[in-house]
């Protein structure tokens, strides 16, 4: 059975107030002056004070072994802010810090440790506010309005480095080789780690470490670094520094899932919903010029136009990729929404998923057996539900404490207004008819004989994604659904959380005293006309799931208030994020893939054509992380996801899985 909770650090604080690991019998930082040691060993050892002003790129990437209390990160962040203040016109504008931690501190222990360094308080408080829950994998934190990115990888560094996507290869400008002393934690200091550091290091990239142990120096040399000794900090006689003089050969183990970015920084996004809005922000943060083409006269008139949508993860005991993606997508979404400097109706009131029949009870029991962190999900008994949710249901379930509801339409509009302030250009009433390569870019033909050319194009237009020749074979489908808007009642007004059953019911929105109940499900349909049958079915499903609940019978749908939308979905319930694959070329190039994996070429795709689609019914949960993943890929930056989960998001995945097994592939 796979367990999803990460063990927190087992520590105590000594007489000096320094945290000490009970498991490794070692301090997290020097009792004497940990802050000055960090500045000397890691910032000085990597010559960052000299390199920052001379860096020829807008992004500087630092990787670290062992996040611990975050002292190295906070010290670097402080130094980076000082650099930006002194050199506002420098090419370098953003800092990206990647760190691996097997036993993360609790938020409380982190805050206690940070009391040691009052001068770092402004940065430490921001880190504490976004400190993630103990889930395995990558947690991306966007700090200082996106100028600083922190990727926290929770798990064993030697296991994680073998799971990294190729997007991290040759990206690291400086390594902080830190952690408990080699004698205290020999399992970390391995040749496997040294080789991974070399693989991730950019040509000209450097490393620094506090130790001068001979096996560490020899291991790093064997990996490809040129090493030298330097005077150690304080009473330590020596430390090690190194440089990666030249690029190492980097074979790709899964070329069929390879992701390519773009050397250009100008893009058109086709869409008008939450996916295109969030992608616009993510690209603008990276310095792109972005134009959004929306088919309607205003944004959020499609699937993103609902009054209330539930935010909670999609979990399944039997699907590793689904769990890894949605658990991290959910926590990223909460951090992202909380940090957005815009207003939109929302209430993080929690979500309770109820076991209303034997099948749903079994599913919930399986989820609870995965040892999920209590911050993510907790069991709630039938006798506890009324106290938690405010209404009687006579069944137990699982509660997502950090879940809730938000208004997708308001969110989309507010994000686009923010993006326009940052330079986004929007063209409404532009219905894309087709697109084709022209010179080194794309020619877009819109209805009404309107045309435009752009270097890069992203399709983020929901269920209309497959209407073009390049995307017509994608295995996606449309789902039409109707959400009913119902007036509150004295009993319904007691509902404190979002309820999920064979449908969902939101607490009332104070802005209109209405609840949302839904949604009907019509696979393969794009019909958005009001349906009285759907209206009655939404009510009846609630009554059928809670037959003894009088409040359910009082639900009134007679006002005929509803909203109909169309979602885009996939068979495996995961989004499609990445390059648009070339279907015909994939079948030709991979005709013998099952027998000739070692000879496979990189996945056939359309150059500079990307997609963000098939968010299904969990778009509010998945869209922020999907936008971040795609923007990072397009910009050739580190992607915050492991290789196997990224493969599960690749738009070509359903074809490639069959081809790897020697099975025939059909379009659609």
Curated annotation (Swiss-Prot):
GO terms for biological process: methylation; tRNA wobble uridine modification. Residues 1-245 are annotated as: tRNA (mnm(5)s(2)U34)-methyltransferase. The keyword Glycosyltransferase does not apply. GO terms for cellular component: cytoplasm. Its cofactor is FAD. In the N-terminal section; belongs to the methyltransferase superfamily. tRNA (mnm(5)s(2)U34)-methyltransferase family. This is tRNA 5-methylaminomethyl-2-thiouridine biosynthesis bifunctional protein MnmC. The gene is mnmC.
